[in-house]
Design a protein with these regions (language model features):
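Short runs within selected transmembrane alpha-helices of multi-pass transporters and secretion channels
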Residues: 61-64, 134-153, 159-175, 190-206
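Hydrophobic alpha-helical transmembrane segments in multi-pass membrane proteins
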Residues: 17-32, 61, 93-106, 137-141, ...
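Small-residue-rich hydrophobic transmembrane alpha-helices
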Residues: 45-110, 141-164
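Helix-terminus/linker motif at the lipid-water interface of multi-pass membrane proteins
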Residues: 22-55, 73, 78, 113-121, ...
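Hydrophobic faces of transmembrane alpha-helices in multi-pass small-molecule transporters and flippases
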Residues: 2-30, 34, 55, 59, ...
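Interfacial/gating helices of multi-pass transporter permease domains
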Residues: 6-13, 17, 33-54, 122-129, ...
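Transmembrane alpha-helix boundary and packing residues in multipass membrane permease domains
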Residues: 17, 21, 29, 33, ...
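Short alpha-helical transmembrane segments in multi-pass integral membrane proteins
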Residues: 1-14, 71-137, 180-238
Length: 238
């Protein structure tokens, strides 16, 4: 039996998250088409560098998933103070380790990773300045990944999606196109646009969490689950 209320709750959390991911993919696809106008070397650098970013993101995703589970447990027990402290603690850990990884992997291991895919010196030269941009970008990205996952855990799902649409298409794309095309910075300009988006959303998400704007959603989430649990317990006792 499919319960409409359960499906509604699933979609209320899942659809905004899917919308956010769709927005990111569309933005990245559009900017990749822009990179294509810079030539084959820029496209090759973009592809290889994106794989390197994936190595750094593995740590961010693991911290975010663990934090999401712990935060949801605290909210389910109506321990909002513990949920808040856990999130802030995870953010501190994430920023420190991501900063270390984003410095060491691109700056120290970047040549080794790139040499696996290519020996073209033009690719190395084009990627080098992007390494420095990634140090700042990954700090913003860790804020997004950890906090957005935790906001979903407490039922605050629409705000991250709306901010993703506004920031990606209102910051990342315009800045990337302006710097990359108009200022002739090429691939570096595009990645500065990505960096501006990640940092903008990261600061906004951190502000939303610290101002407790997520608490009303957490309270609604708790009340809804409390009522379900109460009905289930009552049904068992009959």
């Amino acid at each position: 039996v499919v319960h409409k209320k359960i499906l509604r709750q699933i979609f209320s959390i899942g659809l905004p998250g899917a919308g956010e991911n769709l927005t990111w993919n569309l933005q990245f696809l559009f900017m990749t088409s822009v990179v294509g106008t810079f030539g084959s070397v820029a496209l090759a650098t973009q592809g290889i560098y994106f794989q390197m970013c994936g190595l750094i993101m593995l740590f961010s995703i693991s911290v975010a998933m663990g934090t999401e589970i712990i935060v949801s447990h605290h909210v389910g027990s109506y321990k909002l103070g513990l949920a808040n402290r856990q999130l802030l603690h995870s953010v501190k850990i994430g920023i420190v380790f991501t900063a270390i990884l984003s410095v060491n992997i691109p700056l120290w291991l970047g040549y080794a990773v790139f040499s696996i895919f290519t020996d073209d010196p033009e690719v190395f030269a084009m990627a080098r300045p992007i390494f420095y941009v990634s140090v700042i970008m990954e700090v913003g990205r860790i804020l997004n990944i950890i906090i957005i996952n935790s906001l979903r855990a407490v039922g605050d799902t629409k705000f991250p999606m709306m901010m993703a649409i506004l920031s990606m298409w209102g910051v990342s794309v315009p800045v990337g196109c302006f710097l990359g095309i108009y200022c002739e910075m090429g691939l570096l300009g595009v990645w500065i646009g990505f960096c501006c988006d990640e940092c903008t959303r990261g600061i906004i998400m951190l502000t939303r969490w610290c101002t407790k704007a997520w608490v009303p959603a957490a309270k609604r989430y708790y009340k809804l689950n409390y009522m379900k649990k109460h009905k289930y317990t009552k049904a068992l006792s009959m």
